[in-house]
Amino acid sequence: MVKITYISHSCFAVELEHSVLVFDYYQGELPLWDPEKTIYVFASHRHYDHFSKEIFRWTEQYPKIKYILSDDISEASYDASEICRSDLTRIAPNQTETIGNCVIETFRSTDEGVAFLVSCEEKLFYHAGDLNWWHWEEESIDYNRQMRKDYQREIRKLVRKKIDLAFVVLDPRQGGAAFSGIEFFYAERQGKPCVPNAYVERLWIDGSSAYF
């Protein structure tokens, strides 16, 4: 059984038998987890609503904690001096790293930083960060065409991956284009489960949970 908890904005926590994955925390109340579990904290990029140095305070409660940060997050933006270097990994697009019992693969975002594909305890999870089919009416035709091309290129890399659950951007600020990214993802994945994230307060209540 896997427990999914929505924290806020793009942040979800995935609780497994021995591990917890926390993606893109910036605010909100966390559940209480067994301190014997290993906590993996992911930050996909530097935007204020995807990263907070608050995460480094969690070491007081959870001694088995690992941080995986996109390399666009400047080291000057946080004080990680008290964190053992072996507990913090900076990661770039198109990398694969094994950290603890997780195998982590990254993809290039169409905005900043990376998207994560994480294999943990025989489950495979995808978190988009800000990798999305961004389309803005105020931008040029060439800009929007390039965004479509870049997004589709990255998502097609996932076609053969047996993802158990995916967290995919749904941003209503895009108006009629808001569903383009998640619809393309869903079609390429042949209807496999995906969870909308980012600006989805109408769909989720902070702190709400689901199991699968």
Residue ranges and their predicted role:
Residues 14, 45, 104, 130, ...:
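Divalent metal-coordination and catalytic microenvironments
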